[in-house]
Amino acid sequence: MKYVAVGAFPDITERKVKERARARVLSVKGSSEAALWTARRLRAIGYEVEGPVEVEVSVKAVEEAVRSALDTCDLVIVTGGVEPNSAPAFEGVAAALGRALVENEEAKQHVEEYYLLEATDGAASELFPLKRARALTLLPEGSTVFHNPRGPAPGILLEEGGRYLICVPGSLAEAGAIFEEEADPYVRSVIGAYFSTTVHVMTKTWEEDAVASVVEAVSEEAPWVFAQLKRTVRSKEGWGITVTVFAKSPDEL
């Protein structure tokens, strides 16, 4: 299906579209799967991608990695480093940008709603996010919050000197959902890739490793094509592979 993003994309600050743009994916230790997925998607959109670059789980390591990336990149993605009791990614990003960590009401509401829905005892669950998941509500000042439909940790977006910086959880399922449903318009706006077409290819196997090998081969041979196994796309005989191509004009599709 081909679509134009008019009406589907948020109101993004007007900016000059770049012919070429560079992105770096910073993978906080333990989030390599999400980082690899993100790097593949960015290449398909049209970015020159550096990484994933593994970063230790510490505020200082994230701060240094983000500072370095912002020197040369138009887009920086941080995967992982956000857990209910500790969010070194948020803290490190705040330090790198020289911004304060502030309690974000939208993030707080998201965390509370997530645990209220997950809990069997509503009264007990109300205390959980406030006492044990406060790290997920303290965000760098000026953050745009991305809703996470699959977990408690929100994604965030910040703009610094005309560059975008995005943080997503380390889980592939969570990072992918945030990216596709929330972050994509911002990422694509940098290079004007407002158009896309998607097809679903049905396989005849339930072997995930076999499907993964096909996805990897497509990524290596045609990096401008974004292929992924979608567990919600399947037939009676096997998994489906979702294939998306991005473009700057309908004529390119």
Where are these predicted regions, by residue range?
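Glycine-rich phosphate/diphosphate-binding loop of Rossmann-like nucleotide-binding domains
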Residues: 3-57
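Structural motif
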Residues: 24, 55-67, 74-76, 143-144, 163-166, ...
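Glycine-rich beta-strand-to-loop/alpha-helix junction loops that act as flexible
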Residues: 28-29, 48, 76-90, 248
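Polyanion/phosphate-binding surface patch
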Residues: 73-76, 243-245
